[in-house]
Structure formats: structure tokens, C-alpha cells
Amino acid sequence: MKKNLIYTVAFLLCGTLLFGSCQDMLSVDSDRVEYDFESWSPSDSVYSVLGILKTVQGVADRNILLNELRGDLVTVNTTKAIEELQDIYKFDFSDMEANKYLDPKEYYTIINNCNVFLARVDTTLNKNGIYYMMGEYVAVKSIRAWAYLQLAVNHNEIPFFTIPVTKHSIAEELMNGPKLPREEVFDKLIADIKLYENPVTYPMPSWANSKMFPPVRMLLGEMYLWKGDYKNAAKYFYGQITGAMSVHASTNQFPGKNYSDNSNRITRSGKASQGTTSVNNNYSDLFSSTNASLMTVSFSSNEKYGTTSELREIFSPNEIGGAQVLASPGIVSLAGMQMFCTEVDKDNKEYEYGDKYDYQGDLRIKATTYSQIDTNDELQTKYSNIIAKFNMGSLSLAGNLEANFSPTSYTSSVMLQRAELAYLRFAEALIGLDAQGYKDAMTYAMSILKKGAKGVYTIYQNPVYEVREVVDENGDPVMEPDESEDAEEGALKPKYETYLASYQDMLEFDFASLKGFSDNIGIHSRGSGESEVNKYYALDPLCIARYIGCTIRDSEDIEVVAPEVTITYQDSLNYMRDLVLDELALELSWEGYRFGDLVRFAKAMNDNDVLAKRVAGREKENRVTYRDADFEVEEELYTKMLDESNWYIPLPVAK
């Protein structure tokens, strides 16, 4: 019997997935179910992609909640938060069946619907040499890879299949069969989508906004990061950043301009020491539009007309004091520890550092949170640290840095990836390259944070430098003045130069020749002022020692590295990774990346403290970094987080 494709694909697994056991993650009604795909047409294929996008709506909110509730950037309001959210926050996975957010079935719904589509779509159809189903084909492959990526990050080992599953017996066999570890999942996904990384050669569907689908380059870069293949990771993130114009060619818009210049940052003017400071907040504008988005899931603004996101009701409801999830003391403290640098006199190079007067530090957290006062309460109770990123509203910062927020409507879209992520992932990859012998790569990573992506980054793996005598075009030695103490006046000596004699590999990332990058600013400057000239934000021994709590005041009351401390290369490497992890928190807080980031960095640094201390310190108002001996943690949670097995959400057990 001929079936309508919207019904067939969008609801292929509906009526199943009751999730009483492992195989219920992927089940069909019975082995007698039959599906007729012989009459597929191009228009049906378009409708089936829309059906797949509909299923992506079902996981968008939970993707954010699972990553943030287990991380260090939120706390839960125990009087308002539903039990399911509190359990995730406490890493309590004992009642898997009752907690909808822990249920992986909807990810597998997406995956199986993608499998059905990919098995049936005809990519040979063409008109005038244009294969007009390739856009849908690549888009669906990218969605499937994205869904598997989330499962692998959350569960570590998962069932993996690429065949359409239409029978209960097959579903049971797959779900109860061997699980693939994360790296093997990524190997298979990379092989599946690598061919389609160029959005010019393989553009997303012409009928769709390309932001509906995850960019293939971002997916590849992410998976290579997890694998520790930093060369390929850097390649694809660089390609995403510099090739952004082709991704959004339909709008003739260069996304780089949305985040590379001064458009979306927080600036201060005047002297705080004289009480004349003023604040200009353009940063929060990012969250009232999707200009910088790379992947957006669209929702209805009103539940009467379709599916709505629940994030607004969780993070910033209209009810005074009703927020279930709040910004954690940990992220507020991290922001406060930053040094906001204000240029007060450019000619004389005079700068003022914010925390000296108000201890506000980086202002991005201030710019995306607000407070409520219950005017009906005799005590005028104040509720602070309410997260505004998921509420379409107007938020401004007054000169005293109090946020004024006016909520307007339900969130109608949820960004699952935005452009700034590509920059910070690129910086992460550069640091990994430095650890693999690519000299000065971490210096360029610091530039991404501090100065912006400018110039040409040329890095050599295991370079060997030698000294040679300089000769002219005739082969004669070039002479230069001999300035040694015992040299006679006017004496000359042969000139020597250091040159690169050999290297194992060379990489080059060119931003200088590309439009839009000459005015690129460091990501840290979006919330911490003029980071390019900020002496407290640098890759130098004093800043590293300050980060780990190993400085003292000398006899002239100047901060110096403690004499018993020697800053090593490993210290520099750890410091740079910590800075990127901090910047991911400051820039991308509450957007659904955090716990995965913590896991990946802890694995890369071979140090479970990277995750354990940050998570266990989320409720503490620390004024030092987690590297400092005075950093406070909740001991029971800290002990639990030291065990990597507690990082992953268990899959349901077969009954």
C-alpha cells in the first residue's frame, strides 16, 4: 500500500520506543510491519527531510540540558527544579526509565529515520548535470553524524548501525549486540562524511536555510579533536572559519563579520576610579538573532502553533523566582577573576583594570544574566543569576553593571552551534599541535584569544635550526660591525644567521589574504576589554604562575614568580589549555557544550582534576583557579568525578 512519506519517515518509530529495556531504544511494532518506499519522488524526499528535522526538535533542549547540568556553569533551584533535572545535576542515573532527558531513544529515532532516507533516496537524479538530491543527501548524513556524536559523547560506548531498521527482531539484535567505543564511532562517521566537507561542492538543500543542518567541517573538526588528531582538526576548523562565506552564500553574508570585529562585544569608557565609567553592551544582541549561528533548531513561538522549546521556562520564566536552573557561583566567580582592561588614554598607553574597583572582571556573564525582585514580598526578595540567553528579550547593562532585562516572548529557535565555537575549537587544536611538536602553535592559539585571527600562522613540526655564515650574491662573506668589548674601533666581523635547516611537517593557516580578518579581535576582548594590551592576560611566566597560585610580592611590592617555582613547557601547555577551557565557559556558557568539553580536555591533559575540581567547585565562590591549592570543592562530588566511569550516562540495561 502506498504511504505518505511524511508519515512514513517522520513517524516511522512512533508508537514504539517505550523504553522498558535496551532494545526499546530502537524498536518497531512487530516483524509484520511493512514499509513501501518504491514510489518515492523528489518532493517526498524533501518532506522526509522535514520529518527528520522535526525529530531533531525533540533533542535540542535535552542536548543543552545534559551538557550543562553535569558541568560547572549552572546550579539548580532545589525549590523549583523538577526532579529529573535535579537528578542529572547530582549525577543520579538510578531511575533511567522515569527521566526523559536520559532517554536516548529520540537520538536513535533521528538516526534510523536518516538511515531509511539514505537507503532510499536516488542521488543519481539530475537535471542539466545538477544532481538535485545531493543537497538533501549530504544534509541527512550530517544530521546522522551529529546525532551519533552526541550519543558517543554522552554514553562513551553505543550501538552503531547505518541500515534501516524496520523489524523488532533486528532492533533487538542491534541494541543487545556489541557496543562501539567512542573513537571507533568517530572513525566510521569521519569516513562517512569526509567526502562532503566542501560546502561549495556539496551545498546544503537549496530550499532550506543551511543553518538547519550542522556544517560538515564542524563535525569533522569536532571528531578529530576527540581523537587527538589535531592536524586534521585544525584544518577543518580553519576551513569552517575562512570558508564561512560559501556556507551562507544564499544570503550573500559573510558570517565572519558578525564575530570578528567590534560588533558584538562589551565596552567600557571613562575611569572607574573616578566614578565616570559607562558600559555599552552589544554582546547580548547575539541571542536575539541567529546571525552568528551555524546550526539552529527552529521552534514555534507559541505552543498553539507547534512545538516550543522548554528552555525559557527552565531558565527564565515569567514567574518571579521561578527559574529552575541558574548561573553557578563557579561561573560568576570565574568571570569576576578576569581583568577587564579599559584604555583610558591611548596616546600615553594608560589602561585601567576593572577588578581593582568593582571586581566585575569579564562582563559576558553579567550581560547574559539578570535579577528579579519580588515586590509582593515584604522582604523584597532578590533572585539573582537568572540566565537570559534563551529568552527573546531586551537586556542592557547600566553603568553600575546591573542588568536591566525585559522579556518579550518565547524562544523561537535554539542555537546548537555558533561561529565563535569554531574559533575556540581551532585554538584548542593549535595547542594540541604544539604538544605534538609543532613549535609556536600555542602562541597562535593565544592570538586567537588575545588579538584575533590575523596574519599568517606558519608552524613547523620538530624544526631544527642551524647557524650559517651570510654570503652575498657572489658568494663572498657579508661583514658587519664587531661590537664586542675587545674589538677595535671600526672592526668588522662575518655576519651569521639562524635558519631553518629541517623539519618533519609544516602547516600554514593564512588569515592575512582573506577579506574580513584585518579587524579581527580576540575572543576574550568580547567581554574583558582590550585584551590585546592586557598585561594580565598573556602567555608569560608571571601570568602562568599567577594562574596556579605561585606568585609573591617582592621587596618593592611587585608581583613576581615565587623563587622556588620554575615554569616548564608543560606548565605553559596546561595553562593555555586552561585558558581555552575558561574562554569556552565565558563565551559559550549554557549553550550545550560544557560537560563534553570538560571530558575532552581532561582526557587530552591526562588529568581528571581538570573535570573533577571544576565540577565539584561549581557551588563555591572561589577567587582562585582550580589549579590553586586554596580552590574549594564539594568533597563527595569531587571524589565521584575523579572516577571516569561516572562521567558517562549509562545505557538502559536489557531486561
Model-inferred region functions:
Residues 179-185, 248-284, 353, 457-571, ...:
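Surface-exposed intrinsically disordered loops and tails
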Residues 86, 246-455, 468, 472, ...:
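Elongated scaffold/linker segments in the mid-to-C-terminal portions of large proteins
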Residues 152-160, 226-229, 432-435:
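Short coil/turn linking the two alpha-helices of tandem helical-hairpin repeats
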Residues 46-47, 81-155, 179-184, 193-205, ...:
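Conserved, well-structured interaction surfaces
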Residues 22-69, 234, 623-655:
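Membrane-proximal, proline-rich intrinsically disordered regions
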